[in-house]
Amino acid sequence: YLYPNSGQASSIADALRLEVQRLARQHLIKEAYNTEVLAVEKQGRVFKVRTEGWTCESEAVILACGSEAGPKTGSTGDGYRFARELGHQVIRPLPALTGVYAREADRGTLAGVRMDARVTLWIDEELCIAEEGEVQFASYGLSGIPVFQVSRYVSRALEKGRTCRIDLDVCPAYTAEELEAVFVKRGERMKDRKGTEILIGMFPEKLSQVLLGRAGISLKKSRRDWTARDCRRLAGQI
């Protein structure tokens, strides 16, 4: 998927709307809002767009009906019907550019946390795709642009009964070995610090708690009592 430099998909809709308004002012096209399209027909080289009150004829038609993601806004799936009636083959609509539900028990704990990360999708234990960017942890699972980018692959795989797994690397700029070295160096200066205090500045506190818990390191354990294995397990969780 491609985004404009603004990072907002709505910019595309705004650009199209402004161009339509410009052409309408020049009387080159007819502009109509809140008008339900009943049918799109092709007769020879001419397309006819029928509404309740009038019919528009043109040499080309763009079907941009918004799928069926928002019926309240008019996105009722009519575009699929129009496409079929015009002879197009329509594949089954599935969610895309969306968040992903996760089974992890601590997903609620991380709700609201944002973090740059690498998102790697595995389907039936085979690498499918990896994306980097800001990941947003939600009560249901994961969101954010890199998650949106992989979501369409998740939808197709689940439809076919395949197994999906997403790995998150919340510190993609470092290898596990480099992270171990960071923890060792911090240990020289932070011997009396405990728990999330040791990871201050590296990760949000909520995420630090989860990472330490998964590594089996007690939040009450001082850095001086960490073992080399603790550092290795924590680096692996990150």
Stretches found by the model and what they are:
Residues Y1-L18, G70-G74, Y101-A105, R223-D230:
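Short beta-strand to alpha-helix junction loop
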Residues I12-L23, K30-Y33:
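Active-site-proximal cofactor/substrate-binding loop regions of enzyme domains
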Residues E31-V46:
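A conserved short coil-to-beta-strand element within the FAD-binding core of flavoproteins
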Residues A32, R50-A60, A130-G133:
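Core beta-strand elements of the Rossmann-like FAD/NAD(P) dinucleotide-binding domain
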Residues Y33, Q209-Q237:
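A glycine-rich dinucleotide-binding beta-alpha-beta segment and adjacent secondary-structure elements
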Residues V37, C56-K72, A83-R84, V135-Y140:
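Short hydrophobic core segments
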Residues P71-I91:
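Glycine-rich beta-alpha-beta "Rossmann" dinucleotide-binding loop(s) and their flanking helix/strand
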Residues Q89-R92, G99-S222:
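An anion/pyrophosphate-binding glycine-rich loop and adjacent beta-alpha core
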